[in-house]
């Protein structure tokens, strides 16, 4: 068809949005059309050419009757009949999504049809909250984007166009009080109020900060708020720190003066009110309410004052409390303020795993007999189970939102972009009555704790790779995150059109390669959890943890039970994944396990590596291979594919190493060495890629394990390999013979068959009545009686299990009435043996994107 020369965008007067978000979205569409030399008219009546009719819920519209349009907040639809396009939205945000979808098609399209794509398109949100957090951590690097108004316009437009509905500007997250006191140097916005406000009557200020810069900071905050509102985005301001030891930070670059024990709470209260009044577009505030935010746990009086400051602004403002250390008394204090209340636990520790919520926390996260200290009485005491997951927040009758925060501990530098996993996060974000997800964006924590470097915000050292704005490298990442959180069934064309524009003939190779690559680090993180803290464990630029002993103790020793070695690191799902040590113990005992083994993980990683390698092989023969975007994508795919090979070999080596540690048998040394050698070879290959592309010192913190690059990690791995090879001649092991039990363990290890799953199995019931027995039945053949594993959806509790009974060609078990009588929903899975293989129902699908358990909601 011939490209049209004129488009009319018809906005009926009854929409009542002449200056608001719909008008902004219409202008976005008009601008995209004008960039393609199309004349555009926006008005109440069409003036010829293609007509884009904008219609809201309850309005008469053509060409379709709209009968199938979902009556749900944020729903949108596009219909087309010839030269007439209907852009429908249930509400303002739905209309914004409809119009920006058309604008995106115009911008990314390359054919004659300006609006080429899926028609009709009807979409509605799965995750109610879809938030993106941007952290200010480094004055040297972050002022660059904070003061850049055009950057904000472009960035917020990108978020709104990709169906995010909330933006969270996050201040004060760079340090954890009091643990990081010795490291405190860059405190810009750490205690944020005096960097934004002059509060009469308190005498609190920042010595080195001019009044002009302080006022400029506040003006920029107000600008960001207005630009969010203009695009229909909620504006969340995260205030993570309420105090630190202002008089005991000799390395700090700014001095906060005038804070006393007596004036801290009223000052924070009044500053919160002043911020909310000066920036009326702020729709919510996030607070870290455990000791790391500066307020000792149990000091509820401070929070009564702070939340009163929120209420004093005179409008509804959501009080969002970070989950760690959160107790129900704190929730009640927030509730009594009269404001909307939310809790934001971590999705999977301070990292990123596969999309499902971990079945169980690490043993280290269950509450101890006594708290570490009085000021940590909750986060390191009675509420420790909330440290890194949803804890006991998902009660049947909760009256607060639960919004998961996906921290940037796993991956910060390399590209991510798997539509399958992104859709999985969209589905799991609503787990058991939850409300959504907030992502910490790529490059979060860049330059924190005083490690910011001018000119290194973009990580690249090779010329031509850095993008115009820091976030643009991750444009595709935001696209798949946002659109598939909104609608996990979004059409493939919604991300492929961007790849086709940027990558040409390599669009499909880039899609497939990046999809495989994006699963690598989430899986490694889940199966290998030496530390839940992003301050100590960075899987992306991995600090080596030795197979026997040696490297890694300083990074990981505080957060895992010793001995500190690779095979002894726990998993982040103790109910469904076994560590190498646990697996070796089972092999030596001649037992099987229902859990996934390190060899299962290694097999998955090899599949991911093969997928990356196939995409790379395809790409290298294309004339589009040297385009900038494919080069950025494929370099990261090559690094991640190499990491998949490395960790696959490391998991295998760890199984042999754990058998060796338990038996000292010399015959185990060579298999262990073979896998360890292959692991190092894989890292050498990926380090060769990073050495040419990325800076030698990527700074995400001051400690050695939070900075460096892939090639800087290599010498430690090579040194460990030399140490392992020295075991050959070590007198204590060179002639130790094996035992019959070891022979069986070796045979089982060599002949290991993968754990099977039945992810397509359907749950017999989706709801239950509390206080009544809950029968569970499965139709399956098994060698022995299957085992039912069940638990309240409460991470403070351990899993229960019972054997199932054969009945009418299947198996049944009943969860007793006294167990179902609780405030919580239930989850369960079944384990069994079939043809000599462990089997889980439902277990994980081959793409790892589903929930490996059934969820049963209480009526």
Q: Across the structure, where does each feature detected by a protein language model lie?
A:
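Feature activates predominantly on carbohydrate-active enzymes
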Residues: 2-8, 12-18, 23-28, 32, ...
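Catalytic-core regions of glycoside hydrolase
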Residues: 34, 109-110, 165, 177-180, ...
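Short, well-ordered secondary-structure micro-motifs within conserved domains or adaptor modules
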Residues: 40-69
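Conserved, mostly hydrophobic/aromatic
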Residues: 91, 159, 287, 499, ...
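Aromatic-lined, polymer-binding surfaces characteristic
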Residues: 240-265, 278-283, 290-300, 631-648, ...
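C-terminal non-catalytic alpha-helical accessory regions
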Residues: 441, 445-714
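Alpha-helical linker/edge segments of TPR/alpha-solenoid repeat scaffolds
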Residues: 700-734
């Amino acid at each position: 068809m011939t490209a049209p020369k004129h488009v009319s965008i018809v906005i009926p007067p009854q929409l009542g949005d002449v200056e608001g978000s719909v008008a902004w979205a219409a202008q976005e569409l008009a601008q995209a059309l004008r960039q393609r030399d199309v004349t555009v008219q926006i008005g109440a009546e069409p003036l010829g050419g293609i007509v884009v009719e904008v219609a809201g819920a309850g309005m008469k519209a053509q060409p379709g009757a709209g009968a199938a349009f979902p009556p749900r907040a944020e729903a949108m639809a596009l219909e087309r009949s010839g030269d007439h396009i209907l852009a429908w939205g249930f509400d303002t945000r739905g209309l914004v999504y409809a119009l920006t979808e058309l604008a995106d098609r115009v911008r990314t399209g390359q054919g004659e049809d300006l609006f080429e794509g899926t028609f009709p398109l009807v979409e509605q949100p799965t995750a109610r909250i879809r938030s993106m957090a941007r952290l200010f951590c480094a004055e040297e690097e972050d002022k660059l984007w904070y003061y850049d108004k055009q950057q904000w316009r472009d960035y917020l437009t990108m978020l709104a166009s990709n169906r995010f509905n909330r933006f969270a500007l996050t201040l004060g997250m760079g340090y954890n009080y009091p643990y990081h006191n010795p490291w405190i140097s860059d405190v810009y916005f750490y205690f944020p109020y005096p960097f934004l406000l002059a509060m009469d009557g308190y005498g609190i200020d920042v010595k080195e900060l001019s009044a002009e810069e302080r006022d400029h900071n506040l003006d920029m905050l107000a600008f960001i708020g207005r630009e969010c509102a203009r695009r229909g985005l909620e504006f969340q301001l995260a205030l993570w720190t309420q105090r630190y030891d202002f008089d005991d930070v000799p390395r700090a670059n700014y001095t906060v003066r005038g804070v006393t024990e007596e004036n801290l709470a009223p000052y924070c209260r009044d500053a919160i009110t002043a911020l909310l009044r000066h920036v009326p577009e702020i729709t919510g505030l996030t607070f870290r309410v455990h000791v790391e935010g500066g307020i000792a746990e149990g000091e509820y009086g401070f929070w009564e004052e702070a939340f009163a400051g929120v209420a004093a602004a005179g409008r509804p403002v959501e009080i969002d409390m970070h989950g760690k250390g959160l107790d129900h008394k704190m929730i009640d204090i927030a509730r009594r303020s009269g404001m909307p209340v939310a809790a934001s636990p971590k999705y999977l520790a301070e990292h990123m795993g596969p999309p499902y919520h971990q079945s169980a926390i690490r043993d280290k996260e269950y509450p101890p007999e006594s708290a570490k200290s009085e000021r940590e009485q909750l986060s390191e005491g009675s509420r420790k189970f909330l440290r890194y997951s949803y804890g006991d927040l998902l009660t049947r009758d909760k009256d607060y939102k639960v919004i998961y925060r996906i921290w940037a501990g796993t991956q910060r530098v390399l590209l991510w972009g798997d539509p399958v996993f992104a859709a999985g996060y969209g589905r799991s974000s609503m787990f058991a009555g939850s409300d959504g997800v907030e992502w910490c964006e790529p490059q979060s924590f860049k330059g924190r704790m005083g490690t910011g470097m001018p000119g290194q915000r973009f990580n690249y050292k090779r010329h031509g790779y850095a993008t115009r704005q820091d976030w643009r490298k991750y444009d595709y990442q935001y696209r798949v995150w946002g659109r598939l959180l909104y609608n996990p069934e979004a059409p493939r064309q919604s991300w492929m059109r961007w790849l086709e524009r940027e990558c040409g003939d390599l669009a499909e190779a880039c899609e497939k390669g990046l999809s495989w690559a994006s699963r690598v680090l989430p899986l490694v993180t889940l199966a290998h959890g030496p530390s839940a803290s992003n301050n100590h464990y960075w899987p992306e630029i991995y600090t080596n943890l030795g197979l026997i002993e040696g490297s890694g103790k300083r990074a990981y020793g505080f957060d895992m039970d010793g001995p500190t070695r690779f095979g002894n690191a726990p998993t982040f799902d103790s109910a469904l994944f076994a560590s190498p040590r646990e697996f070796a113990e089972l092999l030596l005992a001649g037992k099987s396990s229902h859990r996934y083994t390190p060899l299962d993980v290694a097999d998955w990683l090899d599949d991911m590596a093969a997928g990356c390698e196939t995409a790379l092989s395809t790409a290298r023969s294309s004339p589009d291979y040297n385009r900038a975007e494919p080069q950025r994508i494929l370099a990261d795919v090559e690094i991640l594919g190499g990491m998949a090979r490395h960790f696959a070999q490391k998991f295998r080596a760890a199984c042999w190493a754990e058998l060796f540690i338990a038996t000292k048998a010399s015959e185990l040394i060579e298999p262990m060495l073979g896998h360890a050698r292959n692991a190092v070879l894989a890292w050498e290959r990926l380090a060769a890629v990073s050495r040419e592309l990325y800076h030698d010192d990527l700074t995400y913190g001051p400690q050695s394990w939070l900075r460096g690059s892939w090639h800087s990690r290599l010498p430690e791995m090579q040194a460990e390999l030399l140490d392992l090879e020295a075991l050959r001649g070590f007198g204590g092991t060179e002639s130790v013979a094996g035992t019959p039990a070891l022979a069986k363990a070796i045979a089982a290890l060599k002949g290991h068959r993968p754990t099977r799953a039945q992810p397509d199995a359907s749950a017999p019931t989706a709801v239950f009545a509390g206080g009544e027995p809950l029968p569970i039945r499965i139709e399956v053949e098994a060698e022995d009686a299957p085992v039912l594993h069940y638990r309240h959806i409460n991470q403070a509790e351990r899993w229960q299990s019972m054997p199932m009974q054969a009945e009418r060609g299947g198996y049944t078990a009943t969860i007793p009435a006294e167990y179902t009588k609780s405030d919580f929903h239930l989850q369960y899975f079944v384990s069994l043996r079939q043809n000599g293989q462990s089997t889980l129902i439902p277990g994980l699908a081959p793409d790892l994107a589903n929930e490996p358990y059934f969820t049963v909601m209480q009526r």
